[in-house]
Each structure stands twice: as structure tokens, then as C-alpha cells.
Amino acid sequence: MAIHLYKTSTPSTRNGTVDSQVKSNPRNNLIYGQHRCGKGRNARGIITAGHRGGGHKRLYRKIDFRRTEKDIYGRIVTIEYDPNRNAYICLIHYGDGEKRYILHPRGALIGDTIVSGTEVPIKMGNALPLTDMPLGTAIHNIEITLGKGGQLARAAGAVAKLIAKEGKSATLKLPSGEVRLISKNCSATVGQVGNVGVNQKSLGRAGSKRWLGKRPVVRGVVMNPVDHPHGGGEGRAPIGRKKPTTPWGYPALGRRSRKRNKYSDNLILRRRSK
């Protein structure tokens, strides 16, 4: 990712950075309008996920997470920005005339060829079942359910590692540090997701954050008691509790958010690292 720095003509451009090489020019048959409802609210209009709202209108790009074009070579034509994810996407022209978007693998360049299937080379951007991959392979866009499409390791810079194969299952180490079992017949893409330096990008001003649909973050200790359990008091006051809590009074630190007795509990060999 080529980071472009602006001249310090204004305070907002003094600290802002932008990727000067990636632009967005999507194909009409691979995009469609999408109504972004909710903005962090549930069906009753109550905030359930804070700091969301507003943002620029977006067109959704149809991403081929399944890689259904089997044993047909495709060529990377463009590398584009996608407003719906922090990873870049690339347009693929296949030999049969089909055109698809896929996640951009790190290091892939315009003109490179990719393919998906059962007996394809272990090359960056190629998709194949886990049973055909050697141990230690770096992968992304991993299926959980056979034929459903990739669901794991899809964010910018995400990469998982194939560490074992035994019986009908393969053992993966995910980006979160979790170690879990997945069927060996599930497919994955070789390599790491691109745009690794996304966290090094500086927006430069608050308005750029609002374009992304993110609202300001306010500490509970500066609110009124009606708005947050930490609020109230004269001047700067402590939270008045033994432990920090959420706006609804639940423990804020250390509480597990995963549902109990989930079907996949027996597939997780080691919990994600904190």
C-alpha cells in the first residue's frame, strides 16, 4: 500500500494520509444498492451497538467467497477499494468470459493468474480444499460449512495457519489465536489478505471518520447518571463502583460474550487469546 502524505496547507491535511494507488471503479453488473438500516439500533430503535450512524452511501460489491469457477484460470485486471470492508478487492477475468470480485491477496499484482480446484498449485490466490494443502500453509477466506463460502480470516491483513490434519478434520490456528477443527473438505485461499498497513493509515480529521459511519466515542464518566452508571458527581469523580460496567449495568471487562452450549464448542481446541 502506497501511503500519500498531503502538504500541510490546513490542519486537516497536516496529519491525513491516503492510499494513492487504489481507486474504485466498479462494474455495473457486480454491484447493487443496499439500504443500511439500523445504524446500531435494534427493531425497537434502541442502541445496541454504540458509535454508529451516518456515513456516505455505499454500493455493495458482489464478492465471490465460494470460488465456484473450478479449474478455469483467471487474470487479475484491477485492484479496487471497497467501502464495505477494510480489505481491497480485485476484479478477475476468467477464461470462459466470467468476471468476479475476490479479496485481494497480499502481494498479488495486476496481470497475475489464479485458479481454484482440487489439484491446483499451492500459489498465492489459488483456492483449494484443506486436504490438498501441506501443513504450515498460510490461508485466508476459509469455509466453515462445505459449499457455503469463506467466512473466516477475511479482514485486511488476516491470515490463518494449517497446523494439523487428522481423520476427517483439519486443525487451524486463526488470527485471533483460537485453535479449532474444520472439515478437511472445506476450501480456503492460499496467502494473506492484502492491505496489511490499514492500521497505519491516519484519517487526519473527524469528518473523515463520520464518512465511514462512525460517531464520536464519549466516556461514561463524563455523562449524567441518567445516561450511564459511571455518570454524575461534582467535577471529576470516580465511577463509584468496584468494576466498570456497560451503559446497561453489566460488567464491562472480562465478561464472556459467546453463547453457552453452542454446537461448535467441541470443535474449539483452544480459546482465542485475549
From Swiss-Prot:
It is found in: Plastid, Chloroplast. The gene is rpl2-A. One of its GO terms (molecular function) is rRNA binding. This is Large ribosomal subunit protein uL2cz. InterPro entries: NA-bd_OB-fold, Rib_uL2_dom2, Ribosomal_uL2, Ribosomal_uL2_bac/org-type, Ribosomal_uL2_C, Ribosomal_uL2_CS, Ribosomal_uL2_dom3, Ribosomal_uL2_RNA-bd_dom. The keyword Plastid applies. It comes from Coffea arabica (Arabian coffee). Residues 7-25 have a biased composition (Polar residues). Part of the 50S ribosomal subunit. One of its GO terms (cellular component) is mitochondrial large ribosomal subunit.
